[in-house]
Amino acid sequence: MKFFTVLLFVSLAATSLALLPGSKDELQMKTQPTDAIPAAQSTPTSYTSEESTSSKDLSKEPSIFREELISKDNVVIESTKPENQEAQDGLRSGSSQLEETTRPTTSAATTSEENLTKSSQTVEEELGKIIEGFVTGAEDIISGASRITKS
């Protein structure tokens, strides 16, 4: 039973590490204004009260939503990863990869971003310690189970 509990915790910790921001290449979407407008997106422009709509004809009321049209062709997806970075062969260790993706840059715009980066690094270090403890515990359980023989 302890083995499955440890396995559950290790799985949870690994999943938590995989979901940390910055652990994968982040994608940002940007839109560009266009004259060709095939796709529609609604945004609120004005609101009417219930009293005014009950006494007036609804067809004469201004529309609650106005459609802004954006072309699907003009949506640009850009990666935050530099283009000139060469692909590396082999596997990198998880901790060095996490440190690389969350290291504060000199172009950090605000101190809040720097604080977020530092706290993210602290959380990653603590999760690394927890995972090491789980792995050690799992190894101890497995080695202890191999010594047990049926009578």
Swiss-Prot record:
KW Cell membrane (keyword) present: yes
Glycosylation sites: 115
GO BP: any one term: response to bacterium
Tissue expression per record: Lymph nodes. Associated with the lumenal surface of the high endothelial venules of peripheral lymph nodes.
Modified residues (Phosphoserine): 54, 59, 63, 71
Keywords: Cell adhesion, Cell membrane, Glycoprotein, Membrane, Phosphoprotein, Signal
Signal sequence interval, chain numbering: 1-19
Subcellular location: Cell membrane
Ranges of Low complexity composition bias in the record: 42-52, 103-114
Description of post-translational modifications: Extensively O-glycosylated.
Gene Ontology CC annotation, any one: plasma membrane
Molecular function per GO: cell adhesion molecule binding; sulfate binding
Bias-annotated ranges (Basic and acidic residues): 53-71
Region annotation (Disordered) ranges: 29-123
Role played: Adhesion molecule that accomplishes cell binding by presenting carbohydrate(s) to the lectin domain of L-selectin.
Homology family: Belongs to the PP3/GlyCAM-1 family.
The protein's name: Glycosylation-dependent cell adhesion molecule 1
Organism: Mus musculus (Mouse)
